């Protein structure tokens, strides 16, 4: 039976989960809540048997989960992709936390009502952050080596969202630019991105000063 996902009809915190499942070729069904479906979600929220009800959620025949990182870790663990030693698992966990910092740092700026005032400071600090990630990636193909892991999709998604605000941000970081292209060129990811199921926009909730609305900036 396919896993069931639930989230808003946006990219948000669910997009890395979608990308990871597509890469793995794992079947899933997704319930998408639209812009005007808040009351519908509130009606569903406490009637699904979720321990800590929230979006996104993931339900399969053995588990009901919320929280995007927990979902990613569970899927990775099912496929034997969480590392084979305490050191490897700790490193993956570290990358997860840093990837969430990258994505949420961008999101907090974009959601702020004073976005136009704050974006200058965000963009000023961005090269330092990207240099850290470029140095960490080094000469590896992917973040933990030569094999794809769930954290690659977390970092990829953050980078892809940031480039809507700063289209040239990776020009000084060719290793990150190549990493981003490498993810997009994975056959199943490329196919997914061409499909009608792929959500390109919005990045955030529809009301977000940046990354919201119905269409990307021109």
From Swiss-Prot:
Q: Which UniProt keywords apply?
A: Transferase
Any GO molecular function = glutathione transferase activity
**Enzyme class, broadest EC rank:** transferase
Task: Show where the GST N-terminal domain sits.
Answer: 2-83
CDD domains membership = GST_C_Mu, GST_N_Mu
Positions contributing to glutathione binding: 7-8, 41-45, 54-55, 67-68
- Any Pfam family: GST_N
> EC number(s)?
2.5.1.18
Q: Which GO terms describe its biological process?
A: glutathione metabolic process
Residues annotated as binding substrate are: 111
Please give the Gene3D superfamilies that the UniProt record associates with this protein. Answer: 1.20.1050.130
Report the catalytic activity.
RX + glutathione = an S-substituted glutathione + a halide anion + H(+)
Q: Which residues form the GST C-terminal domain?
A: 85-203
Q: What does this protein do?
A: Conjugation of reduced glutathione to a wide number of exogenous and endogenous hydrophobic electrophiles. GST isoenzymes appear to play a central role in the parasite detoxification system. Other functions are also suspected including a role in increasing the solubility of haematin in the parasite gut.
- Describe its assembly: Homodimer.
The similarity comment for this entry is: Belongs to the GST superfamily. Mu family.
- State the protein's name: Glutathione S-transferase class-mu 26 kDa isozyme 7
Q: Which organism is it from?
A: Fasciola hepatica
């Amino acid at each position: 039976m396919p896993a069931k996902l639930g989230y808003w009809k946006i990219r948000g915190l669910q997009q890395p989960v979608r990308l990871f499942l597509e890469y793995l070729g794992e079947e899933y069904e997704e319930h998408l809540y639209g812009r005007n479906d808040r009351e519908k979600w509130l009606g569903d929220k406490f009637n699904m048997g979720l321990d800590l009800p929230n979006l996104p959620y993931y339900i399969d025949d053995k588990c009901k989960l919320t929280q995007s990182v927990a979902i990613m870790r569970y899927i990775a663990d099912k496929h034997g992709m969480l590392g084979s030693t305490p050191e490897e698992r700790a490193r993956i966990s570290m990358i997860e936390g840093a990837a969430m910092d990258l994505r949420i740092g961008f999101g907090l700026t974009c959601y702020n009502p004073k976005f136009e005032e704050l974006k200058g400071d965000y963009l000023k600090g961005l090269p330092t952050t990207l240099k850290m990630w470029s140095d960490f990636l080094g000469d590896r193909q992917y973040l933990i080596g030569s094999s794809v892991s769930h954290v690659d999709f977390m970092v990829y998604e953050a980078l892809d969202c940031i480039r809507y605000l700063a289209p040239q941000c990776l020009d000084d970081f060719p290793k990150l630019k190549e990493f981003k292209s490498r993810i997009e060129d994975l056959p199943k990811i490329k196919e997914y991105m061409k499909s009608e199921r792929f959500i390109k926009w919005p990045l955030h909730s529809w009301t977000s000063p940046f990354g919201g609305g119905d269409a990307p900036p021109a």
